[in-house]
Amino acid sequence: MKFHYQKTGRVTIGWVAMSEVEITVGATIAYKLSKCPLISCPQLNVIAQYVHNALHGMSEITFATAKCHADDKYDERKGEQIVRTKIYRRVNKLTCRLFEKCCREIIIDLKGRVISVTHE
């Protein structure tokens, strides 16, 4: 996974891309991955680490630091997994998209609700 910053303000780290939504200090962003059995908990921890690194690396741009973890509970019945990102300093604008291995784009809001799923 490569860290990539564009002057448009979008960051792409492997499956994760971020651009612009307002969050406040102390907010927790939950990335909810629905019906994606190919994504295991170790992979989610990798995603969480890359989100952390991206926010840390962009701190001079976004004034953001974050600690991330992946929930180790995987609900087989619902087929979903959650990654949470805790924001400790102010973030001007941030939104998150997670891309999983099936060429599917999942757009999640700040409360962890799936907004849309795109199949290629």
Task: Please provide the spans of the model-predicted regions.
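Catalytic phosphate/metal-binding cores of nucleic-acid and nucleotide-processing enzymes, i.e., regions
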Residues: 1-120
